[in-house]
Regions:
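P-loop NTPase motor domains
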Residues: 1-8, 12-15, 22-226, 230, ...
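Short, acidic/turn-prone active-site loops that include or flank metal/cofactor-
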Residues: 14-17, 262-264
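Feature targets compositionally biased, intrinsically disordered low-complexity regions
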Residues: 18, 37, 315-319
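C-terminal amphipathic alpha-helical interaction region
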Residues: 233-236
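C-terminal regions of RecA-like/P-loop NTPase motor modules
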Residues: 238-321
């Protein structure tokens, strides 16, 4: 479908030779009020928060002290590259940001200087173990400068190759791609649309930082003339403990909903996010292919989605028809 409409597919799930997104590259996400508090501070602080969310996807069991030290080590690494809370990030290019190799050097250098067996050294050793795969077996996914051509008006980031692989790696890669894609939508003078398929994957990891990031994207999109399309088959992941507040924010900041057929429990979960009466709940459980509940403001109607021959052709063999 992408190529039929003149777009580009980027197979990030296949590794660096197909395109790399550097998790340490900083995106310029700040509005006018935030700029008043100091652009560098706002942008770098958000970057550090998103990097901690990234690490939580990659290593859900990471201890709080290790995560805190990771943030400090990243700040030290940024400082070596002239990146501080007072930097003008509009002047940086992709090749000027550090990579995980540079973060790993910071960690190993600090370990070398720690001759005593202390708690700080223990935490640093645990951090080194978490980071080591980034410069070894996972380097083709996460270690390198961003190398993606973003000139196309229609970009699809494909991670299909990883959907059946280790869940933590997949989730970290998906979050990294989402953060990068959001960075492409931050020019208020250009209309853009950010579509996130399989959004439940991000929330299914019960990563509150990641859920908060997606909720912030949904809230802030209109400031940048960006439309968002959030697609999920599992509303249950939006109502999990610790996630519900962000799940509701994602739905509350939507202009309309298109609800297709769902099973009983999924309908009950969805009703925690949007108002559904009993008739609508029963209808959703019985919907067949193409039937949907369309909600736009106060208007609610059952519709039938009729696909055209051109649309069928664009789906290829992956349309499920």
């Amino acid at each position: 479908m992408t190529r039929m409409y003149g777009g580009d597919v980027i197979d990030l799930g296949k590794g660096g030779e197909y395109g790399m997104v550097n998790p340490l590259e900083i995106i310029m996400d700040a509005d006018e009020n935030e700029i008043k508090t100091g652009l560098g501070y706002t942008v770098l602080n958000k970057t550090l928060q998103s990097l901690k969310a990234f690490m939580k996807y990659y290593a859900p069991d990471i201890e709080d002290d290790v995560l805190t030290l990771f943030s400090e080590v990243v700040q030290d690494t940024y400082a070596r590259f002239g990146i501080t809370f007072t930097s003008d990030f509009t002047q940086f290019t992709s090749n000027q940001f550090p990579t995980f190799s540079d973060v790993y050097v910071t960690v190993t250098s600090k370990l070398t200087s720690m001759t005593e067996k202390t708690h700080e050294r223990d935490v640093m050793e645990r951090l080194e173990l978490k980071l080591r795969p980034f410069v070894r077996e996972l380097q083709y996914y996460f270690n390198g400068h961003t190398s993606i051509n973003t000139d196309s008006d229609f970009l699809v980031f494909n991670i299909k190759e990883l959907m059946n692989s280790d869940a933590n790696i997949r989730n970290a890669l998906l979050f990294n791609v989402l953060k990068f894609a959001w960075g492409l939508c931050l020019n208020p003078n250009k209309n853009t649309v950010l579509s996130v398929d399989e959004a439940h994957v991000l929330l299914g990891a019960k990563n509150e930082l990641g859920a908060e990031f997606l909720a912030q994207v949904q809230r802030r999109a209109r400031k940048y003339n960006t439309g968002t399309i959030i697609i999920t088959q599992q509303p249950s992941d939006f109502v999990a403990d610790g996630i519900l507040m962000h799940g509701k924010a994602i739905f509350d900041n939507s202009s309309y909903y298109l609800v297709m057929g769902l099973k009983k429990q999924a309908v009950e979960d969805l009703s925690m996010l949007i108002d559904l009466n009993d008739n609508e709940k029963e209808g959703i459980k019985r919907f067949s292919q193409g039937e949907a509940l369309f909600v736009c403001g106060n208007r609610r109607m059952q519709i039938n989605v009729i696909v055209t021959e051109d649309e069928l052709e664009s789906f290829g063999s992956g349309g499920g028809l």
